[in-house]
């Protein structure tokens, strides 16, 4: 993330949406292994994204993909998630994943910077 160079529409406001990754609530594992579907991986991915965003001078907002895990029968994954899209910050049962707290802290920090 520290080495990313951003030169996107200089002088114009930029909003980034649909960033993030998948995680099964309660699953823990190697934060560097995407296929682990762990909360640790998802949390690290959000941390990396937010670190990159610091280097975008014209960034004006973000919107992670997605808030809640949701049923998606056309997106069947036989090993992880089944008929569910598990990229939410909150599980389909309302449990907050580790990445939810990363984003909460990020937005709280942004509020104090204003």
Identify the residue ranges that each predicted region occupies.
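Substrate-binding clefts and catalytic carboxylate motifs of secreted carbohydrate-active enzymes
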Residues: 1-114
């Amino acid at each position: 993330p520290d080495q990313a160079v951003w030169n996107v529409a200089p002088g114009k406001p930029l909003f980034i949406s649909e960033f993030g990754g998948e995680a099964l609530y309660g699953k823990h594992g190697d934060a560097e292994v995407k296929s682990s579907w762990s909360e640790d991986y998802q949390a690290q991915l959000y941390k990396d994204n937010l670190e990159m965003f610091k280097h975008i001078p014209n960034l004006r907002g973000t919107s992670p993909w997605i808030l809640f895990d949701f049923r998606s029968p056309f997106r069947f994954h036989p090993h992880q998630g089944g008929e569910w899209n598990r990229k939410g910050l909150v599980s389909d049962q309302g449990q907050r994943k580790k990445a939810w707290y990363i984003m909460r802290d990020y937005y709280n920090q942004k509020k104090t910077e204003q």
